[in-house]
Amino acid sequence: MLHLIYISIIVVLIIILISYTRKPKYFRITAPRSVALFHGIHPLNPKNYKTFSEEFETILNNAIEDGDFKGQLTEPCSYALRGGKYIRPIILMEIVRACQLQHSFGAPIYPAEAALAVEYFHVASLIIDDMPSFDNDVKRRNKDTVWARFGVAKAQMSALALTMQGFQNICRQIDWIKEHCPRFPDPNQLGALLCTFVSHSLNSAGSGQLVDTPEKTIPFFKIAFIMGWVLGTGSVEDIGMIERAAHCFGNAFQLADDIKDHDTDTGWNYAKIHGKRKTFDDVAQFLQECKKILHGKKIYTSIWNEIFQKVINVALGT
């Protein structure tokens, strides 16, 4: 029932947001930021994982201080967001960067708002996943889960706030592109495309959450990969291949996690069913296919070596 309520609210928001993104080209959908989210390295300069992580942490802190969350939900939302690995927003930002090295439309796109959106969606799913009605977990990232610290009601409202703010961030990203990249082709249509795609992905994630399968993990990587590709002005015709790359990476990520949790997981676990050796081989195979696709689209950069190694390290327990 809770899942259906969330999806219903999201669908209503999508209809509203899409209608606004079809207004005249220079009509602003969102209020401008009171502060810039980040001042630092040029968006097209190469970065390693540590640099990207620190950059996104600055973006996140500035967004929270700028009022992305209001009132009594500020503390639980901030609490949930801090301390993550930020792999999804890093993937999104790197794909945008790599795409623009091949082609751009004037000023480089800085995808800070889109990166926030994918992290907000992901963290909202973690809050719900930890709830007593799902996994009933009281610890995550070596600290109390949101519901255990702030109560079930605030946890539910925080997940909703994160989801709704994520869509707001997508709209803010479109406004940013209109303001800074006047040669970008039809940003209004892009906004409608992104909102529709994200709502579909969140629905898939919610369905996977109900039955505890990898489908609760993969959709958030699809959001990161595809939003990065589209914002980086990658070809719409190639979205299917980018989605396949995201599917492979998401599967590898989930299977590595299953190996790590082999001895403690009480729910469905691929490694328990097929064994650690086969599961590790599958992780390697999925990563290899993902790498092949990214190479083919000329967006495989040095940071992917770090990202892939992090997945392998999870599987190895190192």
Curated annotation (Swiss-Prot):
Its EC number is 2.5.1.-, 2.5.1.1, 2.5.1.29, 2.5.1.10. Induction: Expressed in the late phase of the viral replicative cycle. One of its GO terms (cellular component) is host cell membrane. Keywords: Host endoplasmic reticulum, Host membrane, Isoprene biosynthesis, Late protein, Magnesium, Membrane, Metal-binding, Transferase, Transmembrane, Transmembrane helix. It is found in: Host endoplasmic reticulum; Host membrane. Binds 2 Mg(2+) ions per subunit. It is a single-pass membrane protein. Its main location: host cell. It catalyses: isopentenyl diphosphate + dimethylallyl diphosphate = (2E)-geranyl diphosphate + diphosphate; isopentenyl diphosphate + (2E)-geranyl diphosphate = (2E,6E)-farnesyl diphosphate + diphosphate; isopentenyl diphosphate + (2E,6E)-farnesyl diphosphate = (2E,6E,10E)-geranylgeranyl diphosphate + diphosphate; isopentenyl diphosphate + (2E,6E,10E)-geranylgeranyl diphosphate = (2E,6E,10E,14E)-geranylfarnesyl diphosphate + diphosphate. It is an enzyme of class 2 (transferase). The chain crosses the membrane at residues 1-21. Its cofactor is Mg(2+). GO terms for molecular function: (2E,6E)-farnesyl diphosphate synthase activity; dimethylallyltranstransferase activity; geranylfarnesyl diphosphate synthase activity; geranylgeranyl diphosphate synthase activity; metal ion binding. It comes from the Viruses. Dimethylallyl diphosphate binds at R140, K216, T217, Q254. Mg(2+) 1 binds at D129, D135. PANTHER family: FARNESYL DIPHOSPHATE SYNTHASE. Belongs to the FPP/GGPP synthase family. Asfivirus trans-prenyltransferase subfamily. This is Trans-prenyltransferase. It comes from African swine fever virus (isolate Warthog/Namibia/Wart80/1980) (ASFV).
